[in-house]
Amino acid sequence: MTQNFKSTRRACYTGYVTQAVVVNLAPLFFVTFQNEFKVSLSFLAALTLVTFVVQIFIDVAAVKFIEKTTYRTLAVFSQFTSAAGLLLLAILPKLMAPEPAIIISALLYSSGSGLSEVVLSPLIESLPTEGKSSGAAMSLMHSFYSWGQAAVILISTLSLKLIGGDNWFFLPLFWALIPVYNGLMFTRVPMAVDMDVHDNSHGLGGLFKQKEFLFVLLIMICAGASE
């Protein structure tokens, strides 16, 4: 089947839905985790911190390794890593001590989410705009996080009511279907430009010398704290 840039846009939009799943699903299980696994409130707070810190670390570290591969490869990897983390969240706590199992899962899906942050924006910006500004396309893509967040919270909450809190592990399995599907899509969709070549004129050290970057980093830290 012939793909066009509409399929690429849809894959980018769905990538932000994946991010919404990764960030918002586990907190819906906090009460369940306390009841079933007897985890502490400090552990749940640490889990939120791990999710945020890993995403920030991947955002920064990607400046180094993104030069050694392609955006397609990273897009596929980000989706499958997110899916793997969600699958492990459903399976690992049943097979080993729950606290390290949940942390391992969070490390994986947070890595995938952080990598998506780095990859999806350049991808959507590179696509032909068909008369619309690239800023409008970027804003639309980011709006899919909000739609995804609303869907994750609503569907998961209703599902927990229907199937019972003891069957919570079915939900990560269900939501993992989205990044699995999207990872497969990213293996097929066309890229607008040759994205094997990247500008590395600033480098990681150069970024930290820019006041704008430090300001945005501070805002992201504050946003993570508010979560």
Each model region followed by its residue ranges:
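Juxtamembrane intracellular "pre-TM" segments in multi-pass secondary transporters
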Residues: 1-4, 193-216
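Pair of pore-lining "gating" transmembrane helices in MFS-fold secondary transporters
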Residues: 2-29, 107, 211-227
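Central cavity-lining transmembrane alpha-helices of secondary-active solute carriers
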Residues: 46-64
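Short hydrophobic/small-residue motifs within alpha-helical transmembrane segments
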Residues: 51-53, 146-147, 220
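Primarily marks hydrophobic transmembrane alpha-helices of the MFS/SLC 12-helix fold
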Residues: 72-75, 79
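C-terminal ends and interior cores of transmembrane alpha-helices
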Residues: 80-96
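Cytoplasmic helix-loop-helix junction between adjacent transmembrane helices
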Residues: 105-143
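Helix-loop-helix hairpin linking two adjacent transmembrane segments in secondary transporters
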Residues: 140-194
